[in-house]
Amino acid sequence: MALTFSSPFLRVVCAGVLAVAAVPVLADSPMPLTELSIGMYRIEAEVAATQDHRMVGLMQRRSMPANHGMLFVFTEQQRHCMWMRNTLLPLSVAFLDEQGRILNVEDMQPQTEDNHCAAKPARFALEMNLGWFKQKGLAAGTKINGVERLAAQAR
């Protein structure tokens, strides 16, 4: 039996090879940066507003500077969950509503597949180094300024 490009088997194999090959490129492609603020605190956040960037997130990163993070911008407000597969850093994630108010903060351990979910429908998730929110005394109800202008970027 000859394989042609019209073969469903070959299409699946080619799609799989291309998807696997794209992961390192996505991990290396820069995400846009934005500045967020919470009272006197300033955060420089990479913006993961596309499905590809949200899938890669902070995977394979070995360090992250203080007051830096990653803001996940979701297309819909719902109960999103995060996990730590292939993520080497311990992180804390704050789930945020449409206005940028923290719904809940979850601590996440590296290279685990435990789900960490928003307590209520969330539009954003902000990942920071483990303990960052607690060290700053930030909890549910605190507003993070700057996220609301990014909602339209999600795709």
Language-model regions, residue ranges each:
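Cleavable N-terminal signal peptides
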Residues: 15, 25-26
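Bacterial N-terminal signal peptides that target proteins for export
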Residues: 2-14
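Compact, glycine-rich, soluble single-domain proteins
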Residues: 28-155
